[in-house]
Amino acid sequence: MKKGIQFILGLAIIGLVYVVANLIYTPLSFDQQLEERNAEVIVKLKDIRAAQRAYKSKYQQFTGDFDSLINFILNDSLTMERKLVDEDDSVAMAQLKKQGKKNIETYNIAVVDTIFNPRKLTKEDIQNLRYIPHTDNKVEFIMEAAHVNAGNVQVPVVECRAPYKLYLDTVAYRQNVINLIDDRVNNFNAYAGLKFGSMEGSNNEAGNWE
């Protein structure tokens, strides 16, 4: 009888230790996953934003279509400007003036060769820009573009976002994700995920992580 009670108490203690350890470990493990996966999503959002800004610089509008954006990155070019001579070089500047030339020239450069510098993205990387990390390349970022009226002027706007529930582990950390979303929405009145830009007005494509 006594041994039976001791055995049951032993099991209870082991169970209690497990519960306490899990209560400590799970939030720490979730915070680590949140930090790591947020970082991966932010890298892609920054790349998409760089592409959108380049697209706007050429076409005076953003695009809400990933096919168009990816085609732009892979196949289009940008017109850039550079100085012909150092403006502190008085002799060279005098020669340009004599020739009736301005100290500037334009040239074209492939979009893919400039917007991600100093990083180099492969064709596969670019084709997969549309996909949110940790979704097995099955779920795309939510991307929208339009024009909004701002002081009787039509202003191009863009928004690209990834909800927490799409890239966090909602099986292992179901309650943690629920609590995170509830906190963002109800306590901070903020988007429950990561995004840049806004469809409500121009905000210089600011990211909500910045």
Predicted regions and their residues:
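Hydrophobic membrane-insertion alpha-helices, especially the h-region
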Residues: I5-L23
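Short, structured coil/loop segments at alpha-helix boundaries
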Residues: M1-K2, N71
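Low-complexity, acidic interaction segments enriched in glycine
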Residues: S57-E210
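Amphipathic alpha-helical segments typified by the pilin-like N-terminal helix
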Residues: V19-E40
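N-terminal alpha-helical membrane-insertion module
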Residues: K2, F7, T26, F30-Q32, ...
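N-terminal alpha-helical signal peptides/signal-anchor transmembrane segments
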Residues: N38-Y59
